[in-house]
Swiss-Prot record:
Its EC number is 3.6.4.-. It catalyses: ATP + H2O = ADP + phosphate + H(+). This is Actin. It is found in: Cytoplasm, Cytoskeleton. Actins are highly conserved proteins that are involved in various types of cell motility and are ubiquitously expressed in all eukaryotic cells.
Length: 322
């Protein structure tokens, strides 16, 4: 589990219990939580209230099962389930804005007004980090490098995280890279072999803006952000356009803020001010927002306690966690 599995990946097959933000393998997930409580945090779960986060528009059963495991397997005194994007906004010191959160399994656009997510305008895009890693594996194969095993996928993920960037103008960048080798970078594989990566550096994350690269029919993140804002009340759109906060690991590419600014400016009315906020710590802003929320004195009445769970069962999570 965790880093130990990574360090032995050469002889193991790596599996992920979460797909597109939804837990698909509960036994494995329980092992990860066990590892987190006992080996990483080194705390006694039965003494530690724990906040969990999830993607918006997740199946209700997912929440209930999560709550059930926390109370029945780990005997927590209290728990709370909250939506990731809202926490990212808190971490940026805002209560109103549109959050574009993109992690490993799912991306979502969540408009928040005065601290409340607007459920009718939340849009979800099942295109995120893992899809980009798979796509990079595919286009690296076209270059003649073979990456197929789960261990090799982790190498490609590392290449993606270290070398990929988002082009401001994709066509222009393609022309530049065809004419010169200025964007070529080399990467040393664990076995010492050095490989070269060229236009794959920006072709890979370009799929966020052009999902057709992955054979998907959905529109890109910029259009999804715009659609989400347009689903909101006309009076608050101006505030949302001026507070677009990006968060999650898949927003860490250099160039993402400038590109979003350019694309959304092209979609929005000319008079509207558009501001993209991309805090440097955005990979962890959900966690930061969670620690802010959990430490507020006003939040202490919000926890679902073990007593409440024993009385009402897992369904209580829908009543107490908005």
């Amino acid at each position: 589990v965790g880093d130990e599995a990574q360090s032995k990946r050469g002889i193991l097959t790596l599996k992920y219990p979460i797909e597109h933000g939804i837990i698909t393998n509960w036994d494995d997930m329980e092992k990860i939580w066990y590892h987190t409580f006992y080996n990483e945090l080194r705390i006694a779960p039965e003494e530690s209230p724990t906040m969990l986060t999830e993607a918006p528009l997740n199946p209700k059963a997912n929440r209930e099962k999560m709550t059930q495991i926390m109370f029945e397997a780990f005997n927590l005194p209290a728990t709370y389930v909250t939506i990731q994007a809202v926490l990212s906004l808190y971490a940026s010191g805002r209560t109103t804005g549109l959050v574009c959160d993109s992690g490993d399994g799912v991306s979502h656009m969540v408009p928040v007004y005065e601290g409340f997510a607007l459920p009718h305008a939340i849009l979800r895009l099942d295109l995120a980090g893992r899809d980009l890693t798979n796509y990079l594996m595919k286009i690296m194969t076209e270059r003649g490098y073979s990456f197929t095993t789960t261990a090799e996928r982790e190498i490609v993920r590392d290449i993606k995280e270290k070398l990929c960037y988002i082009a401001l103008d994709f066509e222009n960048e393609m022309n530049v890279s065809a004419a010169s080798s200025s964007i070529d970078k080399s990467y040393e594989l664990p076995d010492g072999q050095v490989i070269t990566i060229g236009n794959e550096r920006f072709r890979c994350p370009e799929a966020l803006f052009q999902p057709s690269f992955l054979g998907m029919e959905s529109v890109g993140v910029h259009e999804t952000v715009h659609s989400s804002i347009m689903r909101c009340d006309i009076d608050i759109r101006k505030d949302l356009f001026a507070n677009i906060v990006v968060s999650g690991g898949t927003t860490m590419y250099p160039g993402i803020a400038d590109r979003l600014q350019k694309e959304i400016t092209a979609l929005a009315p000319a008079t509207i001010k558009i501001k993209i906020i991309a805090p440097p710590e955005r990979k962890y802003s959900v966690w930061i927002g969670g620690s802010i929320l959990a430490s507020l004195s006003t939040f202490q009445t919000m926890w679902i306690t073990k007593e409440e769970y024993d009385e009402s069962g897992p369904g209580i999570v829908h009543r107490k966690c908005f």
